């Protein structure tokens, strides 16, 4: 679920719509939630326990775990977003095409998944093979 939240937040950054909502697995069961207050978005598991947070300052968003320890960063670029681990090593990137589909890549440039948003505002996450793995709204 942590990976899903990371991808979710990048998608929210890309669309500028990070406010509050729920996350679901591929079967439609609720797995957690997220809520934004100012420049900070906090994530929760399905029981309401805090799992982490994201704080944005300019073009850089820093990810923290539930204890407040820095876990990595997301930096906005001209082509999308690039992610880094807590040591500053590049871990991947996200790019959005003209159709509104966001594709995620690993540090070697290999596709790892994608995100698509429908007309109702629900964003669905797919793995590299196109299989649905979760959604949020």
Please place each PLM-identified region on the residue numbering.
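Intrinsically disordered, low-complexity proline/glycine-rich segments
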Residues: 21-137
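Bacterial N-terminal signal peptides
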Residues: 6-15
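Sec/Tat signal peptide C-region and signal peptidase I cleavage site
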Residues: 16-20
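Positively charged n-region of N-terminal signal peptides that target proteins for export
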Residues: 1-4
């Amino acid at each position: 679920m942590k990976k899903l939240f990371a991808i979710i937040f990048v998608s929210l950054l890309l669309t500028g719509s990070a406010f509050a909502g729920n996350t679901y697995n591929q079967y439609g069961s609720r797995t957690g939630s997220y809520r934004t207050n100012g420049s900070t978005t906090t994530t929760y598991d399905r029981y309401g326990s805090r799992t982490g947070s994201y704080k944005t300052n300019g073009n850089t968003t820093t990810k923290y775990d539930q204890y407040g320890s820095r876990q990595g960063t997301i930096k906005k670029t001209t082509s999308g977003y690039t992610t880094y681990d807590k040591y500053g090593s590049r871990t991947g990137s996200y790019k959005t095409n003209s159709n509104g589909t966001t594709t995620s890549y690993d540090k070697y440039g290999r596709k790892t998944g994608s995100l698509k948003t429908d007309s109702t505002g629900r964003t669905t996450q797919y793995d590299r093979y196109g299989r649905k793995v979760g959604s949020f709204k």
